[in-house]
UniProtKB/Swiss-Prot annotation:
Name listed for the protein in its UniProt record: DNA ligase
Gene Ontology biological-process annotations: DNA repair; DNA replication
Lineage of producing organism: Bacteria, Pseudomonadati, Pseudomonadota, Gammaproteobacteria, Lysobacterales
Similarity remark: Belongs to the NAD-dependent DNA ligase family. LigA subfamily.
GO CC terms: cytosol
Enzyme class: ligase
Record organism: Xanthomonas campestris pv. campestris (strain ATCC 33913 / DSM 3586 / NCPPB 528 / LMG 568 / P 25)
Keywords for the protein's UniProt record, in alphabetical order: DNA damage, DNA repair, DNA replication, Ligase, Magnesium, Manganese, Metal-binding, NAD, Zinc
The gene coding this protein: ligA
Essential cofactor(s): Mg(2+); Mn(2+)
PROSITE patterns the UniProt entry points to: BRCT (PS50172), DNA_LIGASE_N1 (PS01055)
Length: 833
């Protein structure tokens, strides 16, 4: 009689067989067993694990389905940002990309890794000791959403790495996508069942990963291709991008078979054309190709610019186009007042999406294209994403059309629409008196990358603004649960009488009579003979209501309580988030971050004259003037005061950066004021001759001539300073500069950090802080934090489960610090956790 196999051995054998089948199917494209056999093996494994729950593990193939997310996705901070790529649409742009790399690295024919650019959803997969522990979306590049449970359902993603030699921590970056055939089959099945079909494979992939129930995601035919790595700790990777991809394939990750190594711009363009010709026959959607410098050391030398690497480029295919009819041209007002013309179109399918609106960019673009209502136009999804009107089919223009003109008044508030000299953009002059601008300002203020008020959707923002409940963003911090519930009750009522019927359920007799009196006061005929004013809802809210008793009749209140909690949570923020949330024109996240790093305190920034902003890296004259204009407005200063008075707290204030001492001087200020004829050389001469604007204003020409300043420059300077507003700006800027410099230590008094010149390595898991936080604190004390141990390492910080780095440090005689010693050292030097 044959003995029954040991359950643990059988489970191990089944797991290995199933994962091997997954690897052969998704990575090697060499299916070895039939689907029915695969299903039989999986069912057997499920039965064995159910009978022996002590043998179940997180990396078992049976654990791909069954995880339920919380009511929302948790945020994940990417250790290494998931950067976007620069785009190219022409051969010339590709040639320029190659030229820059050639010159920087002094290589005549750089070698690149070229690969298709999948039209899916970018994700990051984190593995620790070979096991999948977390998956996140790209999000804004710095912060994504934890979609681990959903990613477990994607069979192409390994739950445990194959082979050996992988780093202790490995983040793999790639694209989740929906194959075309699977997309069509899924939609066909949905039509048979009367279910909802997917618009296109890209939307299908993105929507599937954002399901809160992983069982729904598991029903979607998703796949995955790896294209790079993020954080790597305690381990090494091959020296080139192409060999790194080959290594990822050996560890179990699918990598596109279309990846190639090519040389120079000619090799890149040949690859681009070949993939473009094959595009329609590929089993998945792509919207271009990606070029990456193959040499990883070269990538590090090239570095990054803004939010994109200098060593990579996305070469987009020509946008897909269709023709349709312009039914109307309307104006949309943005948060800075920009009036953007939008074409309302007869619905048309473009690249798998129904397009009903397309941007016309600005009035100059409309005039150049001569777009008119009634025209047949070519609609393009530029970069396969943003619909735009690319041209007019003039021969199909109907008779009687008229050239379009920018309206003179804002369609929302009636304020004048004006165009600043030299600008392409027209703007509503109503500023925050314009409801459209207020709504956009609110949307921006509460967005995730700004104040991050979760749960405040666009429609409810419209209700808040239209009702007059909030006039400025600071009014958010005056809201309470009762107001929110009343607001929803009123905004969802289709008539005053419908509202009164509902209100009666939540009010005592006296309070209800008070509401009826208020209704009469705003012009509502309680008998119902006369029609109610169209603005009755807003008028009623402005008139005020008594407190409702929500316990008289049960009503859903959790949403309002959650929203108030989110508003309360947002009170504690950082300076860069606060600055970004203010919605200052031209001030994005990177600019806000730079302002925070250089100036340190809101009170400093909000009172600086604009020329001083120009010394911050990446801030030019246009951005500096925009900052100055914003803070010059009394209404904006009042809005900031209101936010602070209502409890918004900026928790990361710090002194101005010592770098300002080397960046600011009287000569620099002369240069940055944009005075005609005052070049950097002339600014140095002027600064050598005199020390202040007060002295310059009082000075005669002779001392300046004797200092070598040409007479035309002196005349231009004197003419500029003769205007009172210029003299006031110059003297205010110098006073502000002197005040800033007075806060900084003298150059010879700046003390070296306790770890200056020392190289430190961190390994293992720390309990009190993340490794990234430890790195930041050590770097602030002067250390260079490296990824590998060598004889030059000053000391190694070893947390729990320290790996090979600890062994190497001990063999080299490197000093070992435990977490307690690290925390004590940080505390001693003002970096307490």
């Amino acid at each position: 009689m044959t003995a029954s196999p040991d359950p643990a051995q059988r489970i191990d054998a089944l797991r290995q067989r199933i994962e091997d089948a997954n690897y052969r199917y998704h990575v090697l494209d060499e299916p070895q067993i039939a689907d029915v056999e695969y299903d039989r093996l999986l069912r057997e494994l499920e039965a064995l694990e159910a009978a022996h729950p002590e043998l179940a593990t997180a990396d078992s193939p049976t654990q791909r389905v069954g995880y339920l997310a919380a009511s929302r996705f948790a945020e994940v901070r990417h250790v290494l940002p998931m950067l976007s790529l620069g785009n190219a649409f022409s051969d010339e742009e590709v040639a320029e990309f190659v030229r820059r790399i050639s010159e920087r690295l002094e290589r005549k024919q750089p070698v690149f890794c070229a690969e298709p650019k999948l039209d899916g959803l970018a994700i990051s997969l984190r593995y620790e000791q070979g096991e999948f522990v977390q998956g996140a979306t790209r999000g804004d590049g710095a912060t994504g959403e934890d979609v681990s449970a959903n990613l477990r359902t994607v069979k192409a993603i390994p739950l445990r790495l194959r082979g050996t030699g992988w780093p202790e921590v490995l983040e793999v970056r790639g694209e989740v996508y929906m194959p075309r055939a699977a997309f069509e089959a899924y939609n066909a099945q949905m039509r048979l069942q009367g279910g909802k079909v997917l618009a296109n494979p890209r939307n299908g992939a993105a929507g599937s990963l954002r399901q809160l129930d992983a069982r729904i995601t598991a029903q979607r035919p998703l796949s995955f291709f790896a294209y790079g790595v993020g954080e790597v700790a305690d381990g090494a990777l091959p020296p080139t991008h192409s060999t790194m991809l080959a290594q990822l394939r050996e560890w179990g990750f699918p990598v596109s078979q279309l990846v190639e190594v090519v040389q120079g711009s000619e090799g890149l363009l040949t690859y681009y054309r070949r993939i473009g010709e094959a595009r329609d026959g590929l089993p998945f959607d792509i919207d271009g190709v990606v070029y990456k410098l193959d040499d990883l050391a070269g990538q590090r030398e090239m570095g990054f610019v803004s939010r994109a690497p200098r060593w990579a480029l996305a070469h987009k295919f020509p946008a897909q186009e269709q023709s349709t009819t312009v039914e109307a041209i309307e104006i949309q007002i943005g948060r800075t007042g920009a009036a953007t013309p939008v074409a309302r179109l007869k619905p048309v399918h473009v690249a798998g999406v129904v397009v009903t609106n397309a941007t016309l960019h600005n009035a100059d673009q409309i005039a150049r294209l001569d777009v008119r209502v009634g025209d047949t136009v070519i609609v393009r999804r530029a970069g396969d994403v943003i619909p735009e009107v690319a041209g007019v089919v003039a021969e199909q223009r109907p008779a009687g059309t008229h050239a379009w003109q920018m309206p003179t008044q804002c369609p929302v508030c009636g304020s004048e629409i004006v165009r600043e000299e030299g600008q392409a953009v027209w703007r509503c002059s109503g500023e925050l008196t314009c409801p459209a601008q207020r709504k956009e300002a609110f949307r921006h203020f509460v967005s995730r990358r700004a104040m991050d008020v979760d749960g405040l959707g666009e429609k409810f923002i419209e209700v808040l603004v239209d009702s007059g409940v909030v006039q400025g963003v600071a009014d958010l911090y005056l809201l309470n649960v009762d107001q929110l519930l009343q607001l929803r009750l009123i905004s969802t009522a289709d008539s005053p009488h419908a509202f009164l019927r509902e209100a009666r359920e939540h009010l005592a007799a006296g309070a209800y009579a008070q509401v009826e009196q208020t209704m009469v006061g705003i012009g509502v005929d309680l008998a119902g003979v006369q029609p109610a004013p169209q603005t009755w809802q807003a008028d009623l809210l402005r008139a005020g209501l008594p407190a409702f008793d929500w316990n008289r009749k049960k009503i859903a209140t959790k949403w309002a309580e959650n929203l108030i909690e989110a508003i309360e949570t947002s009170r504690d923020t950082t300076l860069e988030r606060f600055l970004f949330a203010l919605g200052i024109e031209h001030v994005g996240e990177s600019t806000a971050k730079a302002l925070s790093a250089w100036f340190g305190e809101l009170d400093v920034i909000r009172h600086l004259p604009w020329p001083l902003f120009k010394r911050v890296p990446d801030i030019g004259g246009e951005v500096a003037r925009s900052l100055g204009h914003f803070f010059d407005q009394a209404g904006n200063q009042q809005a900031i005061d209101d936010l602070l008075q209502r409890g918004v707290r900026i928790g990361d204030a710090h002194p101005p950066s010592p770098k300002l001492r080397g960046a600011l001087s009287f000569a620099v200020l002369l240069e940055d004021l944009d005075i005609p004829k005052v070049t950097p050389v002339r600014a140095q001469q002027l600064a050598a001759a005199t020390a202040s604007f007060d002295a310059l204003i009082a000075s005669e020409a002779d001392p300046l001539l004797q200092a070598g300043v040409p007479a035309p420059v002196i005349a231009s300077l004197q003419q500029w300073l003769a205007r009172p507003e210029n003299a006031a700006l110059a003297t205010a800027a110098q006073r502000a500069m002197d005040a800033l410099l007075a806060q900084l230590p003298q150059a010879d008094a700046v003390q070296a950090g306790p770890l200056d010149g020392q190289t430190v390595v961190i390994t293992g898991t720390l309990a009190a802080l993340t490794r990234d936080a430890a790195k930041q604190r050590l770097e602030s004390l002067g250390a260079k934090v490296a990824g590998s141990v060598s004889k030059k390492t000053a000391f190694l910080v070893a947390g729990e489960e320290a790996g090979s780095k600890l062994d190497k440090a001990q063999s080299l005689g490197v000093e070992i610090w435990d977490e307690a010693r690290l925390l004590a050292f940080l505390s001693e030097h003002g970096q307490a956790v």
